[in-house]
């Protein structure tokens, strides 16, 4: 073979190799597909944090409303790229409602995005549009007292655990619950003709946990639950009674396999 022919063949092999490498890289490194509404990766199950606000018979002060805003922003800031944040409220009908359908994965800030595959400015604008405006709407009306005949806290938490995007297949499930923790349904109620002997009136936590598991299964097992225990001076509950309510809940959560932590949420 003449040297010129050899060089030509060698160049063809090199070019073919380069083109093959480029094609392979384009195939392997193509951007993952994102859901346009949630910004979550398609066909992946991300870790999920839910902030649930109790709107039943809870009158939040202006200071508490501002702190709720901060709590949600802190939850947002704690997300790793790809993790999900949702807002829920327990409304006047005793129903859990996905507040303004807000449920968004963190795609990363614009400066964290690879500009070869996605437009950083569009990602940033999309994320801000899906977070800031719905958040502002979600906080509207928090200062209004909503008259509610029931407060199904236990049932609502268990129901969250049965959602497809928050069931036991979801890694690192976390709920931040903002509530006075005053359960009031047929399952059980903290209310009575008088508030004396509260500890004696509350049902056995093991029985409550068993009733929930009979209805919802082990939906809450493994969930990390952070409770912001709302204090309201106008509601007449003494610190001693609030301590009894907290201890009762802690036993229920222990039986359900929930890892709970508590913080006071003063007026």
Predicted regions and their residues:
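Von Willebrand factor
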Residues: 44-170, 174-176
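Short, surface-exposed, charged loop/turn segments at secondary-structure junctions
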Residues: 187-202
């Amino acid at each position: 073979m003449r040297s010129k022919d050899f060089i030509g063949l060698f160049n063809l092999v090199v070019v073919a190799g380069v083109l093959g490498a480029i094609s392979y890289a384009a195939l392997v490194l193509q951007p993952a597909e994102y859901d346009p509404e949630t910004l979550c990766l398609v066909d992946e199950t991300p870790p999920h944090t839910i902030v649930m606000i109790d709107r039943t018979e809870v009158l939040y002060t202006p200071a508490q409303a501002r702190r709720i805003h901060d709590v949600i922003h802190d939850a947002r800031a704690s997300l790793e790229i790809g993790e999900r944040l949702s807002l829920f409220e327990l409304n006047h009908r005793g129903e859990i409602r996905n507040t303004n359908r807000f449920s968004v994965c963190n795609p990363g800030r614009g400066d964290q995005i690879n500009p070869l595959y996605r437009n950083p400015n569009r990602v940033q604008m999309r994320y801000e549009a899906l977070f800031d405006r719905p958040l502002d709407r979600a906080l509207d009306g928090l200062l209004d007292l909503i008259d509610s005949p029931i407060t199904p806290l236990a049932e609502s938490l268990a129901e969250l655990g049965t959602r497809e995007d928050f069931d036991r297949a979801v890694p690192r499930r976390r709920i931040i619950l903002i509530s006075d923790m005053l359960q009031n349904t047929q399952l059980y109620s903290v209310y009575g003709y008088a508030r004396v002997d509260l500890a004696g009136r509350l049902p056995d936590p093991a029985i409550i946990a068993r009733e929930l598991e009979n209805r919802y299964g082990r939906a809450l097992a493994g969930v990390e639950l952070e409770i912001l225990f709302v204090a309201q001076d106008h509601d007449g509950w003494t610190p001693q009674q609030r301590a009894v309510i907290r201890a009762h809940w802690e036993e229920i959560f222990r039986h359900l396999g929930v890892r709970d932590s508590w913080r006071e949420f003063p007026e």
